[in-house]
Curated annotation (Swiss-Prot):
Function comment: Core component of the survival motor neuron (SMN) complex that plays an essential role in spliceosomal small nuclear ribonucleoprotein (snRNP) assembly in the cytoplasm, is required for pre-mRNA splicing in the nucleus and acts as a chaperone that discriminates target and non-target RNAs of Sm proteins. A major component of nuclear bodies known as gems (gemini of Cajal bodies) thought to be storage depots of excess SMN complexes. Required for normal expression of spliceosomal snRNAs and for U12 intron splicing.
Record's keyword annotation contains Nucleus: yes
Variant or mutagenesis effect after changing residue 20 to V: Does not affect homodimer formation
Effect recorded for residue 70 to S: Does not affect homodimer formation
Protein name: Survival motor neuron protein
Pfam name, any one: SMN_YG-box
Gene inactivation effect: Embryos lacking maternal and zygotic Smn die between 0 and 4 hours after egg laying. Zygotic mutants form pseudopupae or fail to pupate and instead persist as third instar larvae, often surviving at this stage for several days. Larvae are smaller, developmentally arrested and have reduced motor function. Mutant larvae exhibit reduced CNS, testes and muscle size, decreased locomotion and altered rhythmic motor activity.
Source organism of this protein record: Drosophila melanogaster (Fruit fly)
GO cellular component: Cajal body; cytoplasm; cytoplasmic U snRNP body; Gemini of Cajal bodies; I band; neuromuscular junction; nucleus; plasma membrane
Domain annotation Tudor: ranges: 69-128
Length: 226
């Protein structure tokens, strides 16, 4: 190999070495910039955390929403046995037990509810809707027995009794659960309709069995002994 060729090879080696050194320096510079950026971001986060901690300590701790308190006469809502919320008025409070008695608007039935389970009312419009629906249901229930009872006298709900032959006193019709106030979906309405049908079916089934047993007992008493 000639001296010129050897010189060319030597020059290439120097070029490669210089390139590698330049790349290494560039990588070191990039690494330093990344490290500086990371350290700066960590310092900013630490400063923000210290500032937030100082604000919390200055105000006496983290702020939390105050619980809603109710008193007698306030409107509130609670979850009934059918899993739906209904509007009512607080009629009494037992501080020792942490409970209150809530009277549902329109239905006039009362339920003991934990104070922590009480929820704020949805407003005047929803309360009025519930009241109108309850009264409509009551009118429909009163019109059905009137058509089927014939000459039976009309008595207040609290003293109403169903007497059958033989002197047996039937219990009053069980209270029908309040209907949906328009806030639930179709599934909830179907569920309440099912409960209503179940209540009515159970009452009239018991009424039929009671009449049948009373009739059988009366027939046995009238049969002369041999």
């Amino acid at each position: 190999m000639s001296d010129e060729t050897n010189a060319a090879v030597w020059d290439d080696s120097l070029l490669v070495k210089t390139y590698d050194e330049s790349v290494g320096l560039a990588r070191e510079a990039l690494a330093r910039r990344l490290a500086d950026s990371t350290n700066k971001r960590e310092e900013e986060n630490a400063a923000a955390a210290e500032e937030e901690a100082g604000e919390i300590s200055a105000t006496g701790g983290a702020t939390s929403p105050e619980p809603v308190s109710f008193k007698v006469g306030d409107y509130a809502r609670a979850t009934y046995v059918d899993g739906v919320d209904y509007e009512g008025a607080v009629v009494s409070i037992n501080e020792e037990k942490g409970t209150c008695v809530l009277r549902y608007l329109g239905y006039e039935n009362e339920q003991e509810v934990l104070l922590v389970d009480l929820l704020p009312s949805w407003g005047k419009r929803v309360r009025r809707e519930q009241f109108l629906i309850a009264k409509k249901d009551e009118d429909e229930q009163l019109s059905r027995p009137k058509a089927s009872a014939g000459s039976h006298s009309k008595t207040p709900k609290s003293s109403r009794r169903s007497r059958i032959s033989g002197g047996l006193v039937m219990p009053p019709m069980p209270p029908v659960p309040p209907m949906i106030v328009g806030q639930g979906d179709g599934a909830e309405q179907d569920f309440v309709a099912m409960l209503t049908a179940w209540y009515m079916s159970g009452y009239y089934t018991g009424l039929y069995q009671g009449k049948k047993e009373a009739s059988t007992t009366s027939g046995k008493k009238k049969t002369p002994k041999k």
